[in-house]
From Swiss-Prot:
Pathway connected to this protein: Cofactor biosynthesis; adenosylcobalamin biosynthesis
A molecular function (GO) term: ABC-type vitamin B12 transporter activity
Gene3D superfamilies reported in the protein's UniProt record: 3.40.50.880, P-loop containing nucleotide triphosphate hydrolases (3.40.50.300)
Keywords recorded for this protein, A-Z: Cobalamin biosynthesis, Glutamine amidotransferase
Pfam families: CbiA, GATase_3
GATase cobBQ-type domain segment(s): 254-455
Protein family per UniProt: Belongs to the CobB/CobQ family. CobQ subfamily.
One GO-annotated biological process of the protein: cobalamin biosynthetic process
NCBIfam families in the cross-refs: cobQ, PRK00784.1
Protein name: Cobyric acid synthase
Phylogenetic lineage: Bacteria, Bacillati, Bacillota, Clostridia, Eubacteriales
Protein origin, superkingdom: Bacteria
Residues annotated as the enzyme's active site: C335, H447
Length: 512
């Protein structure tokens, strides 16, 4: 059986749109009849995705697999690095935590093994699929990191992939960044770059043409496309850079929801759908900044619950949240944020930090103990708590996923929010989450909760009713994932020379 054809998307820097373009290409190749898969050798992110087998990979590769119409596997992102403290990170290998390492430890003790692992995963995927869409990281020309960079040109060589270099014109300096990146590559790496894509363009393309002609003449490499700035693509963004300046991700301000932007916030994609509901203003508020007078507050997940809770207290944000809760403002906690809402958090094995215990916000009658083993599961569940006066979907099935080491014990004044009925494919009956006596403070370990449209609609409508606003219907909620992937593919296909891309990949006429 022939090995899969490959294409690799690299960038001149972080946040130029590599992940989104790879997602679009996965969908385009799927639409064209190819059996396609994504790949990224090593990902550094706090937004992770749980596979059907309970493995943890980068969120972007999970979305790319969805766009490709396949189930994500751990081979699609064999190494995931999750920053835990300023000089320390958890290294996840083939979906399971290996160890906490410093950058120096990683380089000395694991990097050679990682290179071999990447090669094995690429070979496995190339034998299974017809096309492999590979994503790089940051820039391939980071001189100080070049000797330990396994995710860019070293991956391209292992996969025998032509490289498309992408730059973000919206930030300015696009031609300097492309030419400069190319100049800093080794000669054999430069030869592997097959062409360029200019991303996030606004304005008249005619005004850009002299620059495109210069770029092609200077480098001898073609520009395959100029992709417009896609404002409303609706695809989850993995990089926390996406949160910079993101004070309002939805037009309109009937309902104001404040998400606390914890220093080590993880899986902020939990709130993507909320932010696109008509009439909702979703704000990410840094600890220490005024919370204002929101209709609801959300404490999100975090890679280090104890240290982020300490930071909240140092900035006084804990007292602000407590005061809002006392006024009857709904407060929701997801995973680490849920644990923060409790009375006490214990870390006897130093899983999270050197601090053995810390008091929580005391808004829920729960206590959390952190253990060494991490729970990662795809789940099905049912809301069981009748004290939730906003919830009209009791006993309806919802889906989500768990990524946590903390185990929560409920006190007398808290009731379970839901019951997990399926965990990593196994039938179970496990309580999760907690609801306070008055019903407006609640939390859960389940990420992805607000991706369940019926639940989201019920919660949003409860906020609207408190303010005397009319209820929304399901028809008012954003498009589903499949439509988003199709729309993204259509937008990118229209501005990309797919025929030229097929030729670079050796796909001939671009048909299976």
């Amino acid at each position: 059986m022939a090995l899969a054809k490959t294409i690799m998307i690299q960038g001149t820097s972080s946040h130029v749109g590599k992940s989104l373009l790879c997602t679009a290409l996965c969908r385009i190749f799927k639409q064209d009849g190819f059996h396609v898969a994504p790949f990224k050798a090593q990902n550094m992110a706090l937004n992770s995705y749980v596979t059907l087998t309970g493995g943890e990979i980068g969120r972007a590769q999970g979305a790319q697999a969805e766009a490709a119409g396949i189930a994500a596997t751990v081979t699609m992102n064999p190494v995931l690095i999750k920053p835990k403290q300023d000089l320390n990170a958890q290294v996840v290998v083939l979906g399971k935590p290996l160890a906490d390492m410093s950058a120096r430890d990683y380089r000395a003790n694991f990097l050679p093994k990682a290179v071999n692992l990447v090669g094995q995963c690429i070979e496995e995927l190339r034998r299974e699929f017809q096309v492999l869409v590979i994503e790089g990281a940051g820039s391939p020309a980071e001189i100080n990191l070049k000797d330990r960079d396994i995710v860019n040109m070293r991956t391209a060589i292992l996969a025998d992939a032509p490289v498309i270099l992408v730059a973000d014109i919206d930030r300015g300096g696009v031609f300097a960044s492309l030419v400069g990146t190319l100049e800093l590559l080794e000669p054999h790496e430069r030869q592997r770059v097959a062409g360029f894509i200019i991303n996030k363009f606004r304005g008249d393309i005619e005004l850009l043409k002299p620059g495109l002609e210069f770029l092609e003449q200077r480098t001898g490499k073609p520009v395959l496309g100029v992709i417009p700035y896609l404002h409303e693509h609706g695809i989850e963004q993995e990089d926390s850079v996406a949160l910079e300046g993101n004070k309002n991700v939805s037009s309109g301000s009937e309902i104001d929801i404040a998400v606390v932007k914890l220093p080590r916030i993880s899986n902020f994609t939990d709130f993507d759908l909320i932010g696109r509901v008509p009439g909702i203003c979703l704000r990410f508020v840094c600890p220490g900044d005024p919370m204002g007078t929101p209709e609801a507050v959300i404490l999100p997940g975090t890679k280090n619950t104890i240290e982020d809770l300490q930071y909240l207290k140092e900035k006084g944000t804990d007292q602000e949240i407590i005061e809002l809760a006392r006024k009857g403002i709904p407060v929701v906690g997801i995973c680490g944020g849920y644990q923060m809402l409790g009375k006490m958090l214990y870390d006897p094995w130093g899983t999270e930090a050197s601090l053995e215990s810390i008091t929580g916000l005391g808004l829920l009658d729960i206590e959390t103990t952190f253990f060494k083993e991490k729970q990662t599961h795809r789940c099905k569940a049912k809301i069981t708590c009748t004290e939730l006066n906003w919830c009209g979907i009791t006993n309806q099935e919802i889906t989500g996923y768990e990524i946590h080491t903390g185990q929560v014990k409920l006190g007398r004044e808290a009731k379970p929010l839901l019951q997990i009925t399926q965990r990593s494919g196994n039938i179970v009956a496990l309580p999760d989450g907690a609801v306070g006596n008055q019903g407006h403070i609640w939390g859960t370990h389940l990420h992805g909760l607000f991706d369940n449209k019926a639940l989201l609609l019920s919660w949003v409508n409860s906020l609207r009713e408190r303010k005397g606003l009319s209820r929304l219907t399901l028809a008012k909620l954003p498009d589903n994932r499949e439509e988003k992937y199709d729309n993204l593919a259509e937008a990118v296909r229209h501005h990309l020379n797919m025929k030229q891309l097929h030729q670079m990949m050796g796909l001939g006429e671009g048909k299976p």
